[in-house]
């Protein structure tokens, strides 16, 4: 069975669109609350909760991750830039897992996989720190053989394959087939190297029918499509429907 990690970043995006000041000046309850949403997602069957605390704090805030750490019953997957400050925060937070992702202040959302080659020493230091602390470290990378092999060399126990290029090419059959084959080969190579294989980015209620057939999948991290569907159906139904489509 493929596990579902629900990314709740965009609940915080909606909150921050209205409330950017301190809670004391908000004039009442601040909604929507990401922690409340996370608990509802868990009740609906989410196997874990994923949040990305960006360095620019554009959506999830540090207080959110600490409240989540204290509140949720499943697993906390903490997405973070590979920086000394974030590494120290993660070691204090002690989530079940961290996922190292690239960040660009001009991007709307994460635009590609982490370039492990360019940040080899920094990634190694972070992975070693997480391994020593008993926190599972995952690298969010494109399905590129060189990146996957380097992840294994740096002793990362897990990779999350970036499915964004596949999702973007979905309407074009030729490009879609090419990108899906890259994902298949990447998943197979990661598995050969003993890595846990996760995937995420751009997965929705349509392309999940194909994504779920990728070999050796352990977990999918899905956010925007679930939060979008929840606006119409509620978070319970949105999570349950995705779980059904992932594991029919």
Swiss-Prot record:
<feature type="binding site">
    <location>
        <position position="109"/>
    </location>
    <ligand>
        <name>1-deoxy-D-xylulose 5-phosphate</name>
    </ligand>
</feature>
<dbReference type="Pfam" id="PF03740">
    <property type="entry name" value="PdxJ"/>
</dbReference>
<protein>
    <recommendedName>
        <fullName>Pyridoxine 5'-phosphate synthase</fullName>
        <ecNumber>2.6.99.2</ecNumber>
    </recommendedName>
</protein>
<feature type="active site" description="Proton acceptor">
    <location>
        <position position="52"/>
    </location>
</feature>
<feature type="binding site">
    <location>
        <position position="18"/>
    </location>
    <ligand>
        <name>3-amino-2-oxopropyl phosphate</name>
    </ligand>
</feature>
<comment type="function">
    <text>Catalyzes the complicated ring closure reaction between the two acyclic compounds 1-deoxy-D-xylulose-5-phosphate (DXP) and 3-amino-2-oxopropyl phosphate (1-amino-acetone-3-phosphate or AAP) to form pyridoxine 5'-phosphate (PNP) and inorganic phosphate.</text>
</comment>
<dbReference type="GO" id="GO:0008615">
    <property type="term" value="P:pyridoxine biosynthetic process"/>
</dbReference>
<feature type="active site" description="Proton acceptor">
    <location>
        <position position="79"/>
    </location>
</feature>
<feature type="binding site">
    <location>
        <position position="7"/>
    </location>
    <ligand>
        <name>3-amino-2-oxopropyl phosphate</name>
    </ligand>
</feature>
<feature type="binding site">
    <location>
        <position position="54"/>
    </location>
    <ligand>
        <name>1-deoxy-D-xylulose 5-phosphate</name>
    </ligand>
</feature>
<keyword id="KW-0963">Cytoplasm</keyword>
<feature type="binding site">
    <location>
        <begin position="223"/>
        <end position="224"/>
    </location>
    <ligand>
        <name>3-amino-2-oxopropyl phosphate</name>
    </ligand>
</feature>
<keyword id="KW-0808">Transferase</keyword>
<dbReference type="GO" id="GO:0005829">
    <property type="term" value="C:cytosol"/>
</dbReference>
<feature type="binding site">
    <location>
        <position position="59"/>
    </location>
    <ligand>
        <name>1-deoxy-D-xylulose 5-phosphate</name>
    </ligand>
</feature>
<comment type="pathway">
    <text>Cofactor biosynthesis; pyridoxine 5'-phosphate biosynthesis; pyridoxine 5'-phosphate from D-erythrose 4-phosphate: step 5/5.</text>
</comment>
<dbReference type="InterPro" id="IPR013785">
    <property type="entry name" value="Aldolase_TIM"/>
</dbReference>
<dbReference type="GO" id="GO:0033856">
    <property type="term" value="F:pyridoxine 5'-phosphate synthase activity"/>
</dbReference>
<comment type="similarity">
    <text>Belongs to the PNP synthase family.</text>
</comment>
<feature type="site" description="Transition state stabilizer">
    <location>
        <position position="160"/>
    </location>
</feature>
<keyword id="KW-0664">Pyridoxine biosynthesis</keyword>
<comment type="subunit">
    <text>Homooctamer; tetramer of dimers.</text>
</comment>
<feature type="binding site">
    <location>
        <position position="202"/>
    </location>
    <ligand>
        <name>3-amino-2-oxopropyl phosphate</name>
    </ligand>
</feature>
<dbReference type="InterPro" id="IPR036130">
    <property type="entry name" value="Pyridoxine-5'_phos_synth"/>
</dbReference>
<dbReference type="InterPro" id="IPR004569">
    <property type="entry name" value="PyrdxlP_synth_PdxJ"/>
</dbReference>
<feature type="active site" description="Proton donor">
    <location>
        <position position="201"/>
    </location>
</feature>
<feature type="binding site">
    <location>
        <begin position="9"/>
        <end position="10"/>
    </location>
    <ligand>
        <name>1-deoxy-D-xylulose 5-phosphate</name>
    </ligand>
</feature>
